[in-house]
């Protein structure tokens, strides 16, 4: 895997500017919880992506119970699919708030009527396990004019290769591999590589425009005007 990740660094670091900025007042703050689990906030809207999930499912990342205890009231919950390393009905059920996933993506349009600065666009993407297809969506969040892509578990590159002017693209390693194999550039300022195994070995030198999300609790900030 280390050779694969090193090649990815060389391929995706060409001609891209860093995005990690923390000096501005107006920021979208992003916290990496584990797997594809993220918490995002601008101080008004609180969004959880692929969280809560079953801690340690399929030998992926565990997390402390305090992550559940700290979930904000009336947050928005967004899920790419229902596999246990991304979603837990049992853990999600007690929380109020708006909950979106493959079962009701058409309702995401209602968010546009509530805030001109926050929209989520769903894209049906392929996800197969042992040849069996599962209902799966990737998303583009447009927030204060900033565009954030969320791959989830898909390796399907048809959506990402058509997207323009992304500020941050969260991707799993197998999507990276498919993009490299097909020599497809991605129009984004920053990559966040997530859904790594806890024991994943990473290159020692990493370009500033690529973040390997292995350290749980890692913070990313995107400034906006």
Question: Where in the sequence are the language-model features?
Answer:
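Active-site environment of divalent metal-dependent phosphoester hydrolases
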Residues: 54-57, 82-87, 114, 128-130, ...
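Active-site neighborhood of phospho(di)ester-bond hydrolases with catalytic His/Asp-centered motifs
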Residues: 48-52, 73-89, 100-103, 149-153, ...
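Metallo-beta-lactamase
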Residues: 33, 97-145, 213-222
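Active-site-proximal loop/helix segments of hydrolase catalytic cores
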Residues: 128-186
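Binuclear metal-ion centers of metallo-dependent hydrolases, dominated by the metallo-beta-lactamase
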Residues: 106-115, 133, 182-225
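Active-site HxH/HxHxD metal-binding segment of metal-dependent hydrolases
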Residues: 63-119, 129
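Pre-active-site segment of Zn-dependent metallo-hydrolases
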Residues: 39-78, 89, 155-162
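Zn-dependent metallo-beta-lactamase
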Residues: 2-45, 202-209, 214-225
